[in-house]
Structures are given as C-alpha cells and as structure tokens.
Amino acid sequence: MAKKNSQLPSTSEQILERSTTGATFLMMGQLFTKLVTFILNNLLIRFLSPRIFGITAFLEFIQGTVLFFSRDAIRLSTLRISDSGNGIIDDDDEEEYQETHYKSKVLQTAVNFAYIPFWIGFPLSIGLIAWQYRNINAYFITLPFFRWSIFLIWLSIIVELLSEPFFIVNQFMLNYAARSRFESIAVTTGCIVNFIVVYAVQQSRYPMGVVTSDIDKEGIAILAFALGKLAHSITLLACYYWDYLKNFKPKKLFSTRLTKIKTRENNELKKGYPKSTSYFFQNDILQHFKKVYFQLCFKHLLTEGDKLIINSLCTVEEQGIYALLSNYGSLLTRLLFAPIEESLRLFLARLLSSHNPKNLKLSIEVLVNLTRFYIYLSLMIIVFGPANSSFLLQFLIGSKWSTTSVLDTIRVYCFYIPFLSLNGIFEAFFQSVATGDQILKHSYFMMAFSGIFLLNSWLLIEKLKLSIEGLILSNIINMVLRILYCGVFLNKFHRELFTDSSFFFNFKDFKTVIIAGSTICLLDWWFIGYVKNLQQFVVNVLFAMGLLALILVKERQTIQSFINKRAVSNSKDV
C-alpha cells in the first residue's frame, strides 16, 4: 500500500482508477464524519438553544471563509502542475532522474505553492475576525469565555493552514485513503472534545468556576465549540506529519521548507551544457492561481452569500434554524455529491494536464454519466423530499425547536438541493478545462450573479418578508444562472470534440422516467400529501423503490458496462 501511494499516476487509466476509488474513500470518510457530527448534533440539540447554534454557525462561517480564501485557489492550481517533464533536472543519469529526482522536484513544486495559503491566511484571519467582532451582537460579547472562544477559532485556522503542504502532496498523488482517514480521525476528535465539555457542564460534574446560570452555560457551550475546532486542527496536522515521517521523509521525496527548484529549457535538454535556472514558484501555475483566486472570490460570495445575508437580515434564532437546515437538508449533498464533485475536479485536473483528444473525450464521457446519475437522483429528491422531510426531521430535533418554522422550511429546501448538486459538477468541469482567460471571463459573470443574488435576497427577505424561504429562493435563482453559464460552455466544448453534436443530446431519453416520476408525485400528493405517520411513510418508500427499479432497468446497459470495466481492471491488478 505504501508503494502504491508513493507512485504518481500518469496514464488516463491510472488517474480514472484512482479517482473512482478515491470517490468511494471520500464518500466513506464523509459518511463516517457526518455520522459522528450527526450524532453529536442530535445530542447537543437537546442541550442548546437555536441562539447558540446561530452563533456557532457564525463562528464556523468565519473559519470557513478564511480557509477558503487562503487555500482553495492553490489546491485547484497545483493540480495543473505537469508530471510529464517540463525540463526539471538533476545531475544524475537520465533514467534515475526520470524515476526519482523528477518526481521529487514535481512534489517540491507543489509544496512551495502550499506556503501561499499560510501567507494569505495569517493576516486575513486577523483582519476578518477583528472586523466581524465589532459587528457581533452585544449579548454574545458579554458571555463568559467568548473572547477566549474567538482566540481559539483563530488559532485553529492557523494550525490547519500549517497542514496544507502535506495535504497538497497527498492530493496531487491522489492519496484519497490517507486524506479520508486523517479527516475522519480529526472530526471525531473535535466532536468528542465539544460534547465532553458541554455534557460535563450540563451535568455540573466538572464546572469551570460556579456554573449556575444559563448565560454561563451558553458561554461555555461556545467555548466547547471553539475547543472542538482547535482539537480538529491539531489532530489533522499531527496525522499528516506522522504520515510524512513514515512515508515521505525516509525517501527524501520533498522538503517541508521553501526550496528553490532547478530547471533547464526543453530545447537545451539534449545539449551537453544545458542552461539552467531556478525558481520557487512555477510561473504558469502562479499566473493561473491569480486568475483562479479572482474567480473564487465571487464564487465564495455566491456559495456562502446566504450566510452573509442571513447574518445581516435575519434574527439570531433564524440563523440557528438555517444552520440546522444546512446540516440536515444538505446531508445528501455532503455525503454523496460533494465527494463526487471533488473527485471529478481532481480527476479532470490531473487528466487534462495533457490536452490530448483521448483524455478530452474520456472527460466528457465521465461527465455525461455523472450528469445522468445526478438527474435521476434529483428527480427522486424532488418527488419524495418535500412530502417526507418534515416527518423524518421531527424525530431528530428536540422540543426547543418545535415552535420554530423549521419543519415547514425543510420542504422548500428540498427543491434547492438538486440545483446545488448539478451546479457542483458543472463548475468542477469548467474549472478543470477552462483556460486562464475563460476563468477570468467567468469571474466577471460571477460578479454580476453576486449582484443579482444580493438584490433578490433583499427583495424576498426584506420587502416580501419571506424570511428563510426567500433566501432559499434566491439561492435557487443563483444556481440556475450558474448552471446556464457552465452549460453553454460545456455545450461549446462538446461540439468542438464531437462535431455538430450537442452536450444536452445525451439526455434526450429521460421522457419515460420523468413521466413516471410526475405520475407518482401526483398520486402521492392526491392521496397522502405531507407524510404524517409511519404507514404513509412506508407507502412513499414503496413508491420510491418502484421509481428506482424503473431507473435501474432503463440504465441496465450502462451499469453492466461499468461492472465489466471494473472486472477487467481488477483482473489486471491480480
């Protein structure tokens, strides 16, 4: 296993195999971590009020914002580092250079770029936290330990950024198993720390001073959240560093320090006295990073803009309700869609570092199959989600939430999930194949979409008083615009590969399934409506199984082809 992890995947078959296997690892990791956080939230939700969930969601938003702006552009850009040559040299013979030293220089290039997130994140975290601290509700500032909680959140950001060089290397080598394992351990540790502190205070067994009032308990609940985040970051760094000491340092594959890289021009490669230069950052990757960073700024404003809006236009209680919706409503998105989206992005970025026709056509084939899967699953969500979601959610939340509108709002949120998911894979494809100029053009459109999103949110929340439902509708409009933009790009890209053939032509055979889904939906609403008891829920499960059976029969050839390919791949491994 260690040997496999130390090899850079080079052929399209190797990259596809690691990516499909990696998607499974990420899904299992997501399933485990979300199961742990799911259990924790269900335990904590009976101790904590919506107000506390609102402020912890706000603190998590600050942490997520700093980490996103610090590292995501680098994570995307380093995937485009070519592993097919590029004139990186050493003084050893050519064979040894190709096998060992070249790989070392490629990984060192990635490590050098991994320093940039820390340089961005350190000042950004201080500035953003200082700015947001002045805007926090005065009630929370007066809570015990609140300033300590803010400091611990900042410290967790810094510690997590220190693990970035190790993450970048494992990402570039498509070592999904290590990453999934380390993140699972870190999340579990953070959740355990969080729960132990809250539970101990509630039981008053290990009080910090004299904990008698609700204010004291709320202050410690926020402190527990911050301690959990810090424990998560420290554990993640420790796991990655242990992996480095075990698998990388003995082989001297790269240095954790910023290191100059020697290169020579390709046209000088065959001469006896090659002209060599040195650099810290590969120029084409650095230029791509700048353009991607600009684009991601607007993408994050749109992706996380709902939190900005809800912090400005909604009460703390409504913020807590929306945080609960995000946790439960998007559970499927984070467990299934997010790992697939990330695996697709990594797969495409590595595959298309060499733009040959075979790789380009393979990328389209993978995207078409994923899109078909997403459309089927989205149909299931739209047909059965609104009717069943509130029935399932009421068993997971405590009495403190029974007087809120969360059971009604979750039904609206179900319509948002398909748009969120489809946009994820479309933008993953766009970011992987687009040139720097195309990404820059996309950034300008994202700027316009940001303005439309803010305007829609203001109209629907502030003027029409739709509260959280208005925010969800604004998000749906936002996703539709982004899907349309990437859809036009995909269609043009498809026509260049397959002359006079539309990308959307691959989805013309959905008529039967859509009619069946619509019929089931109408019957379900006519005879049952919103599910209120177990008997009605069982009927919906039977309806869902019938629709799923129809989908499986319709796609039986594709499924059989995939199984055959996996069997051939496994036989080669043996």
Swiss-Prot record:
InterPro entries: RFT1. It is a multi-pass membrane protein. GO terms for cellular component: endoplasmic reticulum; endoplasmic reticulum membrane. Pathway: Protein modification; protein glycosylation. Residues 1-24, 70-110, 170-181, 240-319, 394-413, 465-469, 531-532 are lumenal. Residues 46-48, 132-148, 203-218, 341-372, 435-443, 491-509, 554-574 are cytoplasmic. It comes from the Eukaryota. GO terms for biological process: dolichol-linked oligosaccharide biosynthetic process; glycolipid translocation; protein N-linked glycosylation. The chain crosses the membrane at residues 25-45, 49-69, 111-131, 149-169, 182-202, 219-239, 320-340, 373-393, 414-434, 444-464, 470-490, 510-530, 533-553. GO terms for molecular function: flippase activity; glycolipid floppase activity. Keywords: Endoplasmic reticulum, Membrane, Sugar transport, Transmembrane, Transmembrane helix, Transport. It is found in: Endoplasmic reticulum membrane. Pfam families: Rft-1. Intramembrane glycolipid transporter that operates in the biosynthetic pathway of dolichol-linked oligosaccharides, the glycan precursors employed in protein asparagine (N)-glycosylation. The sequential addition of sugars to dolichol pyrophosphate produces dolichol-linked oligosaccharides containing fourteen sugars, including two GlcNAcs, nine mannoses and three glucoses. Once assembled, the oligosaccharide is transferred from the lipid to nascent proteins by oligosaccharyltransferases. Belongs to the RFT1 family. This is Man(5)GlcNAc(2)-PP-dolichol translocation protein RFT1.
